């Protein structure tokens, strides 16, 4: 092997690799100097650490973009010495690809405040005229790139030792070396052995999200987002109804609020009144059950596979919103919808798209004063949740890596992760640890047992409703897991100070035709359960002894509603629960109920907002849908209506409706506005 691979330190392979890494490090330094004004202040230790981590993130770039160089250097035994210029040219081309992409983005990041990915080509393609002023304004970058190109061409190491792989002389050794080279390239290009290939968004796992762009590079961002479908440019004009209250004008870049509203800043939720008459700042726990469709519940008028959940829904301390719709059909679409207020209006998944690094607000980040955590009993890298949530401000992510190793073998389902019952008990133990009396907790747990292939622990086989191996059977198991979760949690001191939100990430199979319709196929439960909080009268008489209580609690109690008497408060709840909501509305509704004044999150609004009529949107087969039960309207990418119908839950047949009337005009204008605004804001990374 000494003859095959000479001293690495003396080989040109090592020198060229070192030069490639040096170029990326240098371009990172230049990018930092040019963009330091919008980055948060960091100390020298953080800066050095970011560069060291950046070298790790440069590995896929060095392997991928310089692959022709390495193939020539390692396998070009017969031609390498005869044609040294080929090595030089290949290295210069690869190097300039890196430098040009980083160089262009050095100036462009000053505008977007982020690293650009493949969408940069879409932007330049949409309007090539933008590029000329950019070159003029950033002439020094162009000049620097030209100088770097000349330097690389002159100084790239060509003469010297190279690995000597000769298939004719030693075919077996050559085969082994080839397979080794391929394995190293594959592992390096993926960035290691983790579940998903290394992407720019993963930088937030190493440094604070605000300086993650310093760690990564534009070439890596382009590689991460290569061949993404992106977002279309909607050229149609919004057809506003007469006397419209919709304030959206996507053509006007200075439009103020539109349908989207990110005006909610860091939010200290006020104290809530307990059933015992005291006041607490409650814990918030989200329980998102995999594939939990409303169809599977008793309150959904279906076969009751969820007797315990039905019991919670009927509890006096529960508010049920019966017209809630998921914004997507995949688990990966749930996180941005619920926790960022971002519906699924892309043909690809937002979490893994070119725009995942956009600076959208996140409920975990906005909940000021809370410890925040997200729990999912699957691999830490699954669906990109950990990287996405960490870069939007989540404090703790708990996946299978954080599950007790001594329990793993017993509780692993053989497919996705930890069975629901033991994982929810693990979640309780973590809640015990987090509830140290210093800060309330805002945590979410996402179950997984009711995911295909629908496995449950052996003791429960043939003992639950539903056919084994079906989603209904595993939903029945998830209901048992919820029952045991609440039985254990009820013994904990933090239980009565906690508000629970229960919903599903999306729906699944059904034996009813309605639940395959464009409305029924998206219906998920939405329950707010507060066992120890006076949830239905939480704002009643909030001003009583307000000044004294504020002195005691040292917290301002913003008034959400006009402190109505009980009969009026019941009317408010009844009005809110009759509205059509989407997953985007869950957080604002919860916060509004807990006392926050007019909270907004992305495209989500509160059901208690008297000015919000309520609706849900999603995309299916390149058609865009808006639901305001029982009405459903669909548009194509040209903004043309392709379907408008009405369908009730107790009727499997939909009723086609004429394309006219105030309801039709409002739905069409609202969906057209959201399509245009969603696309424009994501492309421009505009979230003000």
Give the residues covered by each predicted segment.
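Intrinsic-disorder-associated interaction segments
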Residues: 6, 248, 252, 546, ...
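Soluble catalytic regions of membrane-associated enzymes that act on cell-envelope
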Residues: 194-554, 561-602, 610-616, 620-622
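Bacterial/eukaryotic Sec-type N-terminal signal peptides
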Residues: 1-7, 543, 547, 557
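Phosphate/adenylate-binding glycine loop and adjacent helical scaffold
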Residues: 598-688
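Residue-level recognition of alpha-helix termini/interfacial anchor residues
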Residues: 138-142, 460, 660-664
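Exposed alpha-helical structural elements
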Residues: 47, 119, 130, 218-221, ...
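Transmembrane and membrane-interface helices of multi-pass
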Residues: 2-235
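Residues that form generic nucleotide/phosphate-binding pockets
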Residues: 54, 103, 134, 204, ...
């Amino acid at each position: 092997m000494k003859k095959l691979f000479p001293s690495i330190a003396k080989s040109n392979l090592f020198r060229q690799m070192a030069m490639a890494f040096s170029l990326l490090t240098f371009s990172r330094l230049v990018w930092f100097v040019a963009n330091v004004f919008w980055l948060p202040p960091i100390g020298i230790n953080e800066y050095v650490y970011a560069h060291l981590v950046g070298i790790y993130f440069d590995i896929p770039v060095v392997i991928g973009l310089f692959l022709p160089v390495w193939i020539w250097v390692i396998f070009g035994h017969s031609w390498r010495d005869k044609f040294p210029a080929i090595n030089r040219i290949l290295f210069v081309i690869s190097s300039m690809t890196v430098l040009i992409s980083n160089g262009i983005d050095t100036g462009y990041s000053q505008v977007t405040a982020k690293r650009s990915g493949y969408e940069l080509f879409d932007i330049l393609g949409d309007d090539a005229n933008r590029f000329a002023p950019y070159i003029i304004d950033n002439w020094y970058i162009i000049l620097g790139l030209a100088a770097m190109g000349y330097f690389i061409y002159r100084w790239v190491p060509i003469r010297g030792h190279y690995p000597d792989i000769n298939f004719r002389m030693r075919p077996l050794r050559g085969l082994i070396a080839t397979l080794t080279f391929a394995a190293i390239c594959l592992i390096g290009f993926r960035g290691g052995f983790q579940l998903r290939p290394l992407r720019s968004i993963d930088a937030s796992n190493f440094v604070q999200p605000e300086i993650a762009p310093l760690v990564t590079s534009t070439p890596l961002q382009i590689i991460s987002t290569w061949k993404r479908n992106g977002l279309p440019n909607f050229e149609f004009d919004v057809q506003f109804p007469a006397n419209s209250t919709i304030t959206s004008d996507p053509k006007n870049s200075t439009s103020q609020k539109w349908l989207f509203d990110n005006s909610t800043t860091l939010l200290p939720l006020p104290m809530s009144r307990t059933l015992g008459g005291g006041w607490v700042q409650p814990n918030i726990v989200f329980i998102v059950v995999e594939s939990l469709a409303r169809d599977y519940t008793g309150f959904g008028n279906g076969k009751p596979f969820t007797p315990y959940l039905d019991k919670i829904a009927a509890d006096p301390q529960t508010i049920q919103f019966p017209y809630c719709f998921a914004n997507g059909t995949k688990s990966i679409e749930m996180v941005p919808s619920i926790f960022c207020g971002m519906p699924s209006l892309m043909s690809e998944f937002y979490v893994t798209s070119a725009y995942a690094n956009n600076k959208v607000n996140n409920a975990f980040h906005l909940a000021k004063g809370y410890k925040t955590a997200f729990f999912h009993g699957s691999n830490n890298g699954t669906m990109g949740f950990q990287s996405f949530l960490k870069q939007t401000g989540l404090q703790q992510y708990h996946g299978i890596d954080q599950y007790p190793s001594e329990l793993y073998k017993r509780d692993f389902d053989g497919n996705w992760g930890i069975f629901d019952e033991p994982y929810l008990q693990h979640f309780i133990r973590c809640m015990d640890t987090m509830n140290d009396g210093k800060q309330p907790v805002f945590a979410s747990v996402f179950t997984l047992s009711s995911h295909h292939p629908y496995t449950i622990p052996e003791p429960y086989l043939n003992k639950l409703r539903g056919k084994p191996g079906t989603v209904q059977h595993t939903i029945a198991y998830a209901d048992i897991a919820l029952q045991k979760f609440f039985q254990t949690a009820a013994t904990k001191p933090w239980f009565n100070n906690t508000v629970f939100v229960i919903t599903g990430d999306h729906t699944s199979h059904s034996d009813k035709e309605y639940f395959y319709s464009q409305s029924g196929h998206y219906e998920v439960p939405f329950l707010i359960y507060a066992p120890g909080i006076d949830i239905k009268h939480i704002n009643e008489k909030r001003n009583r002894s307000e000044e004294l209580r504020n002195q005691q609690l040292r917290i301002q109690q913003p008034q959400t509603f006009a402190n109505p008497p009980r009969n009026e408060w019941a009317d408010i709840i009844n009005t809110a629960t009759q509205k059509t909501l989407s997953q985007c509305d869950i957080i604002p509704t919860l916060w509004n109920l807990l006392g926050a004044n007019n909270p907004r999150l992305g495209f989500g609004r509160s059901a208690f907002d008297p000015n919000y009529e309520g609706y849900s949107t999603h995309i299916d087969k390149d058609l865009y849908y808006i639901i305001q039960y029982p009405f459903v309207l669909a548009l194509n990418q040209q903004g043309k209506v392709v379907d408008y119908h009405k369908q009730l839950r107790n009727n499997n047949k939909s009723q086609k409706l004429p394309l006219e009337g105030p309801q039709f005009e409002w739905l069409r204008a609202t969906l057209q506005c959201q399509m245009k605004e969603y696309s424009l804001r994501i492309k421009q990374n505009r979230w003000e």
